[in-house]
Amino acid sequence: MKHSRLLLSIFFLLLIFVACRKQWNATEEDMANYGWILYEEGEYLESYEWFSNSIREDLDYQDGYNGLGWTYGKLVDLDSAVQAFEKGLTKPQNPRMVDIVAHDILAGLTFAHSALKNDSSAVHYGDSLIWLIEQNDGEKTWVFPHDSTTNYLDVHVTLALSYYALSDFTESLGHVQKIKTALNPASPPWLVNTNTIVGRNQLAAEIEYLQNYLQDS
């Protein structure tokens, strides 16, 4: 009898607990945030699932497309990365987010188009990002919030490479100079004569050196 009353008491306590507990459902923001945790841990297939769920929950959730784009990049599906980024660029910023998601998307588009050898598009998106961050009142930089080793200097070196591929050596040299000044503000101007084959070869070698230096930093 006592055993039966104990079971009945436990049963009623469980009913009260279930009735009182507030139901919690993951939002698109929760899903994207967890996707970024997985991304930062290198779990790209899993992060893909969470970012996909995020935009299924809300087709206008910008950071979900942003996460998908960067994840596709890690999975070396660059065409899909571009598509995700381009969709994300049309979506509104989440007012609760501190970081400007459009900046991350523009950087992602710059890197993806450069890897695809779409140099004109890489220049378009990269120049757009550099212009936007230079309008900042404070520090005129960009750092990818989910990997601090990726920043505006990587955008500059990508632009230097794409401008070189487009035979615009003056612009290419300008981006190289911006990187060198950022790394050492006291350094003298780095000048080469890009009207000569020797000068262009020197510029190409410097771009390659800076790419390797930034990757190793």
PLM regions: where:
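Terminal, low-structured helical/coil segments at or just beyond the last alpha-helical repeat
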Residues: T149-T150, V157-L161, A165-S217
